[in-house]
Amino acid sequence: SRNVGPNIDSWSEFQPLGVVAGITPFNFPVMVPMWMFPLAIVCGNTFILKPSERDPSSTLYIAQLLKEAGLPDGVMNVVNGDKEAVDVLLSDERIKAVSFVGSTPIAEYIYATANANGKRCQALGGAKNHAIVMPDADIDNAVNQLLGAAFGSSGERCMALSVAVTVGDETADALVSKMSNVM
């Protein structure tokens, strides 16, 4: 900004951190990395992606597509492995920041270990969603949607529904009655 005051200009400069890493879960092997590496790379960083050892293939395919699209070598990197690979990412002084999505106990471990090693850390664990059922809701449809949201993919989603809030006693009674017939 220019002229924010008499003879005063103001501006902000943002500097890349350097090498940053993302540790991703098995249940969203493409979506969660897509939250991480594009922003890191656009901000001028290089990125190390450590996918779940259960399903690394899609991550390798993403890296291949980025290379084919012209991303320079070394900008997007994939490291496979288990906890040992994670611990290297958390302790290597060249890595300045770590992002994680997964279970709460692992998020706590990653957050504590990354911070103990002086890294910036974003550790998202155990996220669940809530649903609100309004008095004018179609109860049959609400039951179907709630069951799908809670138990779809066997509940192995961080967005799985864990709480349904009903507005009004009549709504709650109707929902419980319909649910008890379904289950």
Where are these regions (language model features)?
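N-terminal Rossmann NAD(P)-binding subdomain characteristic of aldehyde/semialdehyde dehydrogenases
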Residues: 1-37, 71
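Short gly/ser/thr-rich secondary-structure transition/capping motifs
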Residues: 1-7, 79-81, 145-146
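A structured beta-alpha segment of the ubiquitous adenosine-cofactor-binding alpha/beta core
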Residues: 9-10, 77-96
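Beta-loop-alpha module in the N-terminal Rossmann-like domain of NAD(P)-dependent dehydrogenases
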Residues: 20, 27, 80-88, 102-109
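PLP-dependent aminotransferase-like
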Residues: 22, 33-86
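Periplasmic-binding protein-like
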Residues: 38, 97-101
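General beta-strand structural signal in soluble alpha/beta enzymes
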Residues: 49, 78, 100-102, 121-125
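ALDH superfamily catalytic-core signature
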Residues: 105-183
